[in-house]
Structures are given as C-alpha cells and as structure tokens.
UniProtKB/Swiss-Prot annotation:
Name of the protein this chain belongs to: Apulose-4-phosphate transketolase subunit A
Cystine crosslinks: none
Protein source organism: Phocaeicola vulgatus (strain ATCC 8482 / DSM 1447 / JCM 5826 / CCUG 4940 / NBRC 14291 / NCTC 11154) (Bacteroides vulgatus)
Entry EC no(s): 2.2.1.13
Keywords: Carbohydrate metabolism, Thiamine pyrophosphate, Transferase
UniProt enzyme class: transferase
PANTHER family: TRANSKETOLASE N-TERMINAL SECTION-RELATED (PTHR47514:SF1)
C-alpha cells in the first residue's frame, strides 16, 4: 500500500479513536495516539492477516504488550474488517466483548495482555513455535517505553537472542511519557539502544510519527540474520490532537465536549486534505 494511502487510513483511525474514547468516557488516549501509525502500518502493509480467517495458521502474530492502549487496536481491527463498527461502539458498555485491555474474545486478538512486561515473553514463545514447526509467519510485539522498567522483558530479551529468533520483531513506542511524568524522571531509558544491542538484538530506530519512515524501517528488516529485531519508534504522546501532544496527563483521559469537537475538527481537516491529495494523483 502506498504511503499516502496509509497516512489517510491512519488519520481515519485517529478520528475513530477519538470518537470511541469520548463515547465510552474512558481510554488511554495519549498512548493510543502515539502508536496508531505503527498499528496502521502493521495491519495494512506489513503483516499477513485475513479478517475472514482470523485463525489462519499462516497469519503473522501481533501482541499488544502495552495492553492499556487497546482502543488503538480496536479501531485498527475495525478498519481492517475483524470487528464491526457496531461492536466497536459497545466499548465501555456492560456485556461488551471489548474491555479496557485486549482479550481473545475479540477476533484478531492473539492473547490477553495488560499486565505490563509480559507481552514479549509471549512473543518469544510464538516465534519459537514457528521455528519448531518450520512455519514462516512473523511475530510482532508492541511495548511501551514506560514498560521497559519491567524486569521480565529482559529475561525474554535473553531468550530471543539465545534461540536466534530472527522471525520476532519487538517495537518500543518511545513517546517519553508515562502516567507519572517523563520516563527519564521515573526510570532513565537513554541507554535503550545500547542495552538491547548488548542483549544481541538487531536494533533499528525510526520516526513513529512519520509513516514513510515507519514503512522504510519495517521493510529494511533482515529476517535471515539470526537475530531478533527491536524497533525504537520515536513518537509523540497524543499525536495528532494538538492540545494532547506531549502532555503526560493525557496518558489516560477523556475530552470534554468542547475538546472532542476540536479534536474531530483537527483530524477531519487532515483527512480532507489527504483525500484531495490522493484523488489528485
């Protein structure tokens, strides 16, 4: 898929995200917005997935380790065709299959997540299974940067290197903010690239706010180098909604009616601009 088409899809997903968080009156909207470009790139360009066959054995696997940002995953699954708009609209309602963290009740979700630090271990297991079965699917794991304070991640990192899991790609959403402030104030992560390189991983960095760089980086991965891959995705918390960008309090939050209208207006203007540009080509 062309970069311009992916950019448009990401903005449509962004608008839908704002809608469902506002309707549900709950959501980790800041981190949702920072990882939305990566999710769009994965589901609409990089991964092999089939909405009509969500359990197809050849499918690539995705693990949302930063499970509190599940709203971004829901709107991506809706846009891809795994779940309907009617289902997504039930977020926050009693009896809905959509909860505040991913669960396998939802088509397209591989594993229950939300307890931070566990997703990479699951991803390592999935990648090992593919190697043992001589299957060619890839496993992708999206982690938060605040999540890097969890020690279990580094046990999984050692295992990924030990078993030469070059079919495993971990992505860190490096937005530099968590619920209590900046990541550097809470637990410094400036050595991130060096530490993962020391663990034997193939480390790449990308601008997660720019779709072109995301696609270029994913496509540059060497899946034959006998090393697991780590992508450090430099992003902006609250990306795409001006009054949320770079503000820690939007780790979890719901816009007021006025703020909601402002967010929808901002995103809608970008959608209209991108549609005109795409139609003009």
């Amino acid at each position: 898929m062309q970069v311009e088409t992916l950019e448009l899809q990401s903005e449509k997903n962004r608008k839908r995200l704002v809608e469902i968080v506002y309707k549900a009156k709950a959501g980790h909207i800041g981190g949702d917005l920072s990882c939305l470009n990566v999710l769009t790139a994965l589901y609409f360009d990089i991964m092999r997935v089939w909405p009509d066959k969500p359990k197809e054995t050849k499918r690539d696997r995705f693990v949302m380790s930063k499970g509190h940002c599940v709203e971004a995953l829901y709107v991506t699954l809706e846009a891809k065709g795994f779940i309907s708009r009617e289902v997504t609209d039930t977020l926050g309602e009693f009896g809905s299959i959509l909860s505040g963290h991913p669960t396998i009740e939802v088509p397209g979700i591989e594993v229950n997540t939300g307890a931070l630090g566990h997703g990479l271990s699951v991803g390592v297991g999935m990648a090992m299974a593919a190697k043992m079965d001589k299957a060619d699917y890839k496993t992708y794991v999206l982690m938060g940067d605040g999540e890097q304070g969890e020690g279990s991640i580094y046990e999984a990192a050692m295992a990924g290197n030990q078993y030469k899991l070059d079919n495993l790609v971990a992505i860190i959403d490096r937005n530099r903010l968590q619920i209590s402030g900046t990541t550097e104030e809470v637990m410094s992560l400036e050595s991130m690239r060096d530490r993962w390189t020391a663990f034997g991983w193939d480390v790449l960095e990308m601008n997660g706010d720019e779709m072109e760089d995301i696609i270029r980086t994913f496509r540059s991965i060497d899946y034959t180098n006998k090393k697991p891959h780590l992508l450090i995705s430099h992003t902006t918390k609250g990306k795409g909604v001006s009054y949320m960008e770079g503000i820690a309090k939007w780790h979890h939050g719901v816009p007021t009616a006025e703020q909601y209208e402002e967010a929808v207006r901002e995103v809608s203007e970008r959608i209209e601009k991108l549609e005109k540009e795409n139609n003009g080509k």
